[in-house]
Amino acid sequence: MDPGREDEVPLAATSPESRRTRSNGRGKATVGDAPPPAETVVSTKAAPLPTGGWKKGIAILDFILRLGAIGAAMGASILMGTNEQILPFFTQFLQFHAQWDDFPVFKLFVVLNALAGGFLILSLPLSIVCIVRPLAVGPRFLLLITDLVNMATVIAAASAAAAIVYVAHNGSQDANWIAICQQFTDFCQGTSEAVVVSFVAAVFLVCLIVVSTLALKRT
């Protein structure tokens, strides 16, 4: 055997590891190495859950306003429905008597305000649902629709009754209608109070509509 060839290493005997090492020395990527693992960032903060805090406050305000609207609507209906006056000077055959059901408009006033108050009472469970679930859209939208109908009903009844009350107080020279409130003072005062309370119910309903609109607004 030639001693000069002892230091020679055959090319076929070169291991793949040595070739990879030589490639690394030249700045090239290693063939068999796996890519470094991606860094994962773990957040320790808990994701905030949607609680709808301000909407819950609006729902509580809605419930309070609804109670006020119920009291005003039912109060207006009761005031008008119990309003009557008999003048003290009368005989057995002649009486001067004024009663709410003598006027068809006042009958309509009593019925419409009572209906509005009844619908408002029926809407209380939905208002409670909106307090428990302030993010629910369905109950809130249904409340908005019913409040719009009730507002239109109450305003129509109060406006029609206000026209009759005005004629009762001032009369009409063109139609030769005399003012009766100079004689039936208590009756006219009762009708005026009922009309004012009915308009208060309408104001409550307007506030309820604004509250429902704000509650339906997305944040």
Swiss-Prot record:
Membrane topology: Multi-pass membrane protein
Record keywords, A-Z: Cell membrane, Cell wall biogenesis/degradation, Glycoprotein, Membrane, Transmembrane, Transmembrane helix
Positions of the UniProt region annotated as Disordered: 1-43
Compartment(s) where it occurs, according to its Swiss-Prot or TrEMBL record: Cell membrane
InterPro entries recorded: CASP/CASPL, CASP_dom, CASPL
Pfam families with a match to the protein in the record: CASP_dom
Domain of life (superkingdom): Eukaryota
Gene Ontology cellular-component terms listed: plasma membrane
Subunit-level organization: Homodimer and heterodimers.
Gene Ontology BP term (one): cell wall organization
Family: Belongs to the Casparian strip membrane proteins (CASP) family.
Function field: Regulates membrane-cell wall junctions and localized cell wall deposition. Required for establishment of the Casparian strip membrane domain (CSD) and the subsequent formation of Casparian strips, a cell wall modification of the root endodermis that determines an apoplastic barrier between the intraorganismal apoplasm and the extraorganismal apoplasm and prevents lateral diffusion.
Glycan-carrying positions: N170
Bilayer-crossing regions: 58-78, 109-129, 148-168, 194-214
Parts of the chain on the Extracellular side: 79-108, 169-193
Organism, scientific name: Lotus japonicus (Lotus corniculatus var. japonicus)
Protein name: Casparian strip membrane protein 3
Side of membrane Cytoplasmic, spans: 1-57, 130-147, 215-219
Chief site of localization: membrane
